[in-house]
C-alpha cells in the first residue's frame, strides 16, 4: 500500500473515525452510509493500486464485508475504521479476485495508459 517512508498516510472521511463510532452508526442510516461509502472508496483505490488485484474482496459481497467489519469492530472498538478495513483486506488477500471476469464486482475499471492532456491544478 502507498504510504510515507515510515508507513504513515493521511486518512480522510469516515476512515479516521473509530470502530466504536462505526458500531453506533448501525442505528442511523445516514451515518452508516458514510462508512459504507468510505469502504467502497477504499476498496476501489486498493483494487486500482494493488498489483495482481482486480477485486480485493473476491467473492465476498459488500454486505458480507460490512458484517465482517461489524464483528471486527465489536472486538476492536478503539481501532480506526480504516484499520478495520485494512485487516479485512489483509485477511482476504488469498481469496482476492486477480483478474476481470466473475466475482462479486459492482463495476469495472482500467488504469490510464497515457498521461492526461493537462495536469490538474
Regions found by a protein language model. Give the residues of each.
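Boundary at the C-terminal end of the N-terminal hydrophobic targeting segment
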Residues: 2-4
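C-terminal partner/receptor-binding element of secreted or periplasmic proteins
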Residues: 77-121
Amino acid at each position: 500500500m502507498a504510504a510515507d517512508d515510515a508507513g504513515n498516510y493521511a486518512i480522510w472521511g469516515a476512515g479516521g473515525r473509530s470502530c466504536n463510532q462505526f458500531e453506533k452508526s448501525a442505528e442511523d442510516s445516514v451515518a452508516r452510509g458514510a462508512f459504507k461509502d468510505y469502504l467502497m472508496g477504499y476498496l476501489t483505490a486498493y483494487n486500482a493500486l494493488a498489483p495482481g488485484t482486480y477485486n480485493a474482496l473476491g467473492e465476498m459481497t459488500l454486505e458480507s464485508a460490512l458484517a465482517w467489519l461489524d464483528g471486527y469492530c465489536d472486538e476492536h472498538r478503539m481501532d480506526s475504521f480504516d484499520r478495520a478495513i485494512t485487516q479485512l483486506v489483509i485477511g482476504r488477500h488469498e481469496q482476492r479476485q486477480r483478474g476481470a471476469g466473475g466475482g462479486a464486482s459492482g463495476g469495472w475499471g482500467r488504469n490510464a495508459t497515457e498521461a492526461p492532456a493537462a495536469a490538474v491544478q
